Design a protein with these regions (language model features):
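Acidic, Ser/Thr/Gly/Pro-rich intrinsically disordered interaction regions
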Residues: 1-92, 100-234
Length: 234
């Protein structure tokens, strides 16, 4: 059996998080929890993208629910439930990526005052200006630019503990509308008129936050040799 060539070392295709994951051990001696957090930040974001692609593929299945409703006057809405579960998982994975990113920060700056081991508290401390004066400005900016975080956190908290919401295709707009009666805002059930627009917006927000954090952490790496597996060459 002939083994082909497989190039694994390709930094020209890596973002700041992936680059950091390859080279940080020459500078930072992270604990196992920190190492898992670096890996988790990547893995959860990739899972969110995979789930997003799957959700798009499931959209046509909603027509089966509509056909059942038209024929029998009711529908079990199985396909809508499946799509809703995938959609909710996307948001949970994205929050987990943010959470893992914060864990990396917490471990690296564990000796600084006001850097709590909680993502919610971490964001609040930065918003309130209650942190060690030595804390890097770029990491402060990353949080203060993330004005979307608080609403995102509330959504994540609710989705973690509630039953699955529902979705359907709006006949007038052709957009996929998502609704959750258990999640209320000012006494009204959560309704998102275009859930895929919301997903794309959240993907971009999280990607920007993670990118800014690890772009800064990359600048803190020492110019030290790091052993890398480059690939399989035949």
């Amino acid at each position: 059996m002939t083994i082909g060539t497989a190039k694994i070392f390709a930094p020209e295709h890596w973002g700041s998080l992936e680059k950091f994951s390859k080279f940080y051990n020459g500078t930072f001696s992270l604990k196992d929890s920190g190492k898992r957090a670096v890996s988790g930040a990547i893995s959860h974001f990739r899972k969110a993208i995979t789930l997003h692609n799957l959700a798009i593929k499931l959209v046509p299945n909603l027509e089966t629910d509509e056909a059942e409703l038209d024929k029998h006057g009711y529908t079990s809405a199985v396909n809508a439930q499946e799509l809703s579960a995938i959609i909710e998982s996307i948001f949970l994975e994205l929050y987990s990526s943010v959470d893992c990113t914060r864990k990396v920060i917490t471990e690296i700056y564990s000796n600084y005052q006001g850097i709590p081991n909680s993502t919610r508290k971490y964001f609040n401390r930065i918003y309130e200006g209650n942190f060690d004066e030595r804390f890097p400005e770029q990491l402060i900016i990353a949080v203060r630019e993330a004005t979307w975080y608080e609403d995102f956190r509330k959504m994540r908290d609710e989705l973690t503990h509630l039953e699955t919401g529902s979705c359907h295709k709006n006949k007038d707009t052709a957009k996929i509308q998502y609704m959750h009666t258990g999640f209320t805002i000012e006494g009204r059930a959560l309704v998102i008129d275009d859930i895929f627009e919301k997903i794309n917006q959240t993907l971009n927000n999280v990607n920007q936050f993670i990118g800014r954090v690890f772009a800064y952490l990359l600048t803190q790496l020492k110019d030290e040799p790091v052993l890398q597996f480059c690939g399989i060459f035949h």
